[in-house]
Amino acid sequence: STRLMLHSKAQTSVLQLAAERGAVEDIELHEVMLTGFRDVRCVESGGPEPGVGCAGRGIITAINFLEENGAYTDVDFVSYDVLGDVVCGGFAMPIREGKAQEIYIVTS
């Protein structure tokens, strides 16, 4: 979902890099946060292979990583682009934990 903002550049996700390194604690913020169009900071959380594991856990892991590493300092707003057709409760985590003040539903 960040590819257009990053001028077609592919981005390594938090979970992909954590799997390669062995733990999310072994990642540096600058390795997963890229600056795109109009200086928008972009991060992809990533997730498990389809049918394996819970994609919501990826969102939880990524958001916690971003918070712990100061990604939310000096920003005007944060936008999460998440799937809405999945039964996993992990996708509701930003709402449940008070990380979202407003929610916009976009369908296509």
UniProtKB/Swiss-Prot annotation:
<keyword id="KW-0408">Iron</keyword>
<comment type="similarity">
    <text>Belongs to the NifH/BchL/ChlL family.</text>
</comment>
<keyword id="KW-0479">Metal-binding</keyword>
<dbReference type="InterPro" id="IPR030655">
    <property type="entry name" value="NifH/chlL_CS"/>
</dbReference>
<dbReference type="GO" id="GO:0051539">
    <property type="term" value="F:4 iron, 4 sulfur cluster binding"/>
</dbReference>
<keyword id="KW-0560">Oxidoreductase</keyword>
<keyword id="KW-0535">Nitrogen fixation</keyword>
<feature type="binding site">
    <location>
        <position position="54"/>
    </location>
    <ligand>
        <name>[4Fe-4S] cluster</name>
    </ligand>
</feature>
<protein>
    <recommendedName>
        <fullName>Nitrogenase iron protein</fullName>
        <ecNumber>1.18.6.1</ecNumber>
    </recommendedName>
</protein>
<comment type="subunit">
    <text>Homodimer.</text>
</comment>
<feature type="binding site">
    <location>
        <position position="88"/>
    </location>
    <ligand>
        <name>[4Fe-4S] cluster</name>
    </ligand>
</feature>
<dbReference type="InterPro" id="IPR027417">
    <property type="entry name" value="P-loop_NTPase"/>
</dbReference>
<dbReference type="GO" id="GO:0005524">
    <property type="term" value="F:ATP binding"/>
</dbReference>
<dbReference type="InterPro" id="IPR000392">
    <property type="entry name" value="NifH/frxC"/>
</dbReference>
<dbReference type="GO" id="GO:0046872">
    <property type="term" value="F:metal ion binding"/>
</dbReference>
<keyword id="KW-0411">Iron-sulfur</keyword>
<keyword id="KW-0547">Nucleotide-binding</keyword>
<dbReference type="GO" id="GO:0009399">
    <property type="term" value="P:nitrogen fixation"/>
</dbReference>
<dbReference type="Pfam" id="PF00142">
    <property type="entry name" value="Fer4_NifH"/>
</dbReference>
<keyword id="KW-0004">4Fe-4S</keyword>
<keyword id="KW-0067">ATP-binding</keyword>
<dbReference type="GO" id="GO:0016163">
    <property type="term" value="F:nitrogenase activity"/>
</dbReference>
<comment type="function">
    <text>The key enzymatic reactions in nitrogen fixation are catalyzed by the nitrogenase complex, which has 2 components: the iron protein and the molybdenum-iron protein.</text>
</comment>
